Amino acid sequence: LNTEFQGGADFKESCFSDALFDNAEFTGIALFISTKFSGLSLFRKSLFHTEASFEESEFQSDVIFTSARFNGPTSFDRSIFNGTTTFKGTSHQSSTSFEFSKFHRVTDFSITSDISKSDKND
């Protein structure tokens, strides 16, 4: 909680029982590639200054990104969400991708995109 990760944060292929990253600030690239989250995952009000990648990760319980801010490209491609997933009030300054991801429970995607239509890739 309330932690700042200066430079890059590399959690590739890690395992978390409960991931408590509330109010965390990632000043460099945040890599959670192929990471398993077995318990509650909290990223409320977290700030990702640059790229964030959660590709091929598995969230076995609830994951909450309420009011998180993503300033760089973000990927959840090929991830599995087994619990309730909440992205309520998140802000995205760049592209966010959930390509080939699977959601098995109720999902709240009240996302605010700050990308103009001309910047989006269709």
Residue ranges and their predicted role:
Residues 1-122:
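N-terminal leader/targeting and pre-domain segments
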